[in-house]
Regions:
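Catalytic core of the metallo-beta-lactamase
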Residues: 4, 12, 18, 126-186
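Hard-cation-handling environments
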Residues: 201-331, 390
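Pre-active-site segment of Zn-dependent metallo-hydrolases
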Residues: 11-14, 21-63, 75-76, 85, ...
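Metallo-beta-lactamase
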Residues: 93-146, 156, 268-292
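Active-site environment of divalent metal-dependent phosphoester hydrolases
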Residues: 12-13, 67-71, 125-127, 146-147, ...
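Active-site neighborhood of phospho(di)ester-bond hydrolases with catalytic His/Asp-centered motifs
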Residues: 7, 27-31, 58-69, 83-86, ...
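Charged helix-capping and loop-helix junction motifs
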Residues: 175-182, 208-215, 345-350
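C-terminal regulatory/interaction regions
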Residues: 11, 244, 248, 282-428
């Protein structure tokens, strides 16, 4: 049996992990490298010939969630290979790529992407899927993408837990440790833990719960009448934070564009059936000709979800003369480094967009596991053979976590054979 980390050691995003036996081979994630500040992606796998070579002999691909750094190369996969994505995640991904199809000159690209997503095989939590002699069991996790999963992989008497991206400080995080303890470990010990480590370079950073963010946002909404919000359009838990905060400031419409409204409707139709927190009701889709909505926004104020696009540049230019500048704020709720003008991750489009607002407030918490959460998970799982840290700028930093000394000796960041299983780490 063999585990191959094609990509993910010492880099965030672009994750590609392979699990193989003598009879079957699967990939966990087929992520595209993250773009630079200019939006340019450097990725040697971003072409059909490279993916054809990488996936030759692969029986199936499983995606932990719909973020591009985990799913982004899906459209290059040969038709003969089955691709699996969470049931709700598939709906969100389809909504996103259908919208991209409206971009002029992108019609053929989008048609292929939409076709590939439509043919993806959906799965739900704890649904056992067998690919030859490999068994895959998905378990729900909280992340900044809804319907994200960790995978328990069983083959040749070995058990591997691949966490995907996860966190312990979201509304849906309370099930993380009980799921591992009661559903995964009760079936038997884990041999190898493949885990994300995004926060390893930010070990001292305090992560805040979504509830804490909500309280801070409510206070800002009381201070400012006109509230613009820049956050991920598919981060259900963060969107719920803003939606519930806005409901506490009575009488203000929750406004977005028609794409965002479509995403919110998916969340309401799925997670909203289980918890009122994720029932987004009837958000108001903005267009300039909707004079009734514009008048309401002028009179009562609003919470409006925005993105750094030409369309929202136009909406903002339309609204600015009609609202009081002194009562207007942009709440930026994404990673701070995107708007750090001197940082290597600075996004020029984001910087240009936020520059249009008189006041900017940063309110954010990570979609990834904190150092404390990573420690808890590692100690609880307590793998018998090895820990493979991926999705981290410096995977060797895993040694700095306060995990058991016995576990520190099991951290794997280079190729080796352990208990008849070969771990191959391909250096980028």
């Amino acid at each position: 049996m063999k585990i191959t980390i094609h990509r993910g050691i010492d880099q965030i995003g672009g994750c590609i992990t392979e699990v193989a036996t003598s009879k079957s081979r699967i990939l966990i994630d087929l992520g595209q490298n993250l773009p630079d500040g200019e939006g340019i992606v450097q990725d040697k796998f971003d072409n059909r010939s490279a993916i054809a070579l990488l996936t030759a002999g692969i029986d199936a691909i499983f995606y932990t969630h719909y973020h591009g750094d985990h799913l982004g190369l899906f459209h290059l996969v040969p038709e003969t290979i089955n691709q699996y994505l969470g049931r709700v995640a598939k709906r969100v991904a389809l909504c996103k790529y259908q919208r991209l199809g409206y971009i002029k000159g992108r019609e053929d690209i989008s048609a292929n992407e939409i076709n590939k997503i439509e043919h993806m095989l959906p799965f739900g939590p704890e649904q056992s899927i067998e690919i030859g002699d490999i068994r895959v069991l998905p378990y729900f996790v909280s992340h900044s993408a809804y319907d994200a999963f960790m995978f328990l992989i069983e083959a040749n008497g070995k058990r591997i837990l691949h966490t995907g991206d996860f966190r312990g400080h979201g509304y849906l995080s309370k099930g993380l440790l009980p799921t591992i303890k009661k559903l995964i470990l009760k079936q038997g010990k884990i041999d190898f833990l493949i885990t994300e480590g995004t926060m390893l370079t930010r070990l001292d950073e305090r992560v805040r719960h979504e509830n804490e963010l909500k309280r801070e946002i409510v206070e800002l909404m009381k201070q400012y009448k006109n509230v613009f919000v820049m956050c991920s359009s598919t981060d259900m838990e963060r969107l719920a934070t803003f939606h519930t905060a806005n409901k506490e400031v009575i009488g203000r419409p929750f406004v977005c564009d028609d794409f965002q409204k479509s995403v919110l409707e998916i969340f309401t139709d799925t997670a909203g059936r289980k918890s009122p927190l994720f029932n987004f009701g009837k958000p108001y889709a903005f267009w300039k000709e909707n004079s009734k909505l514009v008048k309401w926004m002028q009179d009562k104020g609003f919470c409006m979800l925005v993105r750094a696009t030409d369309k929202f540049d136009d909406y903002l230019a339309f609204l600015k003369p009609q609202i009081d500048r002194n009562e207007t704020v942009l709440i930026y709720s994404m990673w701070k480094e995107y708007i750090n003008p001197t940082g290597k991750h600075a996004n020029k489009r984001y910087l240009d967009f936020i520059g249009k607002f008189p006041v900017i407030k940063k309110i954010h918490t990570s979609g990834h596991a904190s150092a404390d959460c990573l420690t808890e998970v590692c100690n609880l799982v307590n793998p018998t053979s090895g820990i493979i840290p991926i999705h981290s700028e410096h995977s060797s930093n895993f040694n700095k976590l306060p995990i058991k000394d016995e576990l520190k000796s099991k951290i794997i960041t280079s190729s080796k054979i352990i208990n008849e299983l070969k771990v191959e780490i391909l250096i980028k």
